[in-house]
Amino acid sequence: MKNKILVKNNELTVDISAFDDKDEVLSLQRKNFNLILGKDSFLRGFDANLIGQKSLPLYEFSMVIPSDFKDEKLRGKTLDFKVHNKAKIKVNSETNLDKEKIKSLEKELANQKEKNALLLLDNVKLKSEKEKIIKDFKDEIKTFENRAREKIAEKLNLEKQLLENKFEDFKKYGSQKIFESIMPIIQNLLVAIE
């Protein structure tokens, strides 16, 4: 156990004691507890107090109990912990990466970075194409609106001209009818005057 540093996925068998001031918190007491570092299987944030420490038979630290802890009385309290390491560290295979696996992962990471760069480039191209399509569509709408306005203006001018012509015809016809209706009266007056 000497000179080993605790890392994620190390497996420890521990006894855990928790204290609120000097009073032991029995609900957090564990005996022969199998603790896989990084999983936070005992308490959220607990493992972070052990990861990076040298392998020792006893660890002592304080931590604040998470605000979503099941026991409402303990939420937000700072408790003192004693963790007795009872067995040798089991090193899970995930922590023993050999050089070939590291190279493979580095290559995979490089490939993924290249794919991400290509996807980013494609996204930029797609965005540019999308912007061009939107601009072209807006231009077509403006052209259509202008043509529609011209057609409407032509139609209105034609209708206006037709109405003006009808009005002139009506004025001529109306004047003629009025003249025809008063003509007998004028003739009678002329006859009466003579």
UniProtKB/Swiss-Prot annotation:
The keyword Repeat does not apply. It comes from the Bacteria. GO terms for molecular function: peptidyl-prolyl cis-trans isomerase activity. Gene3D superfamilies: 3.10.50.40. One of its GO terms (cellular component) is cytoplasm. SUPFAM superfamilies: Coiled-coil domain of nucleotide exchange factor GrpE (SSF58014), FKBP-like (SSF54534). It is found in: Cytoplasm. Keywords: Chaperone, Cytoplasm, Stress response. Homodimer. Belongs to the GrpE family. Participates actively in the response to hyperosmotic and heat shock by preventing the aggregation of stress-denatured proteins, in association with DnaK and GrpE. It is the nucleotide exchange factor for DnaK and may function as a thermosensor. Unfolded proteins bind initially to DnaJ; upon interaction with the DnaJ-bound protein, DnaK hydrolyzes its bound ATP, resulting in the formation of a stable complex. GrpE releases ADP from DnaK; ATP binding to DnaK triggers the release of the substrate protein, thus completing the reaction cycle. This is Protein GrpE. It comes from Mycoplasmopsis pulmonis (strain UAB CTIP) (Mycoplasma pulmonis).
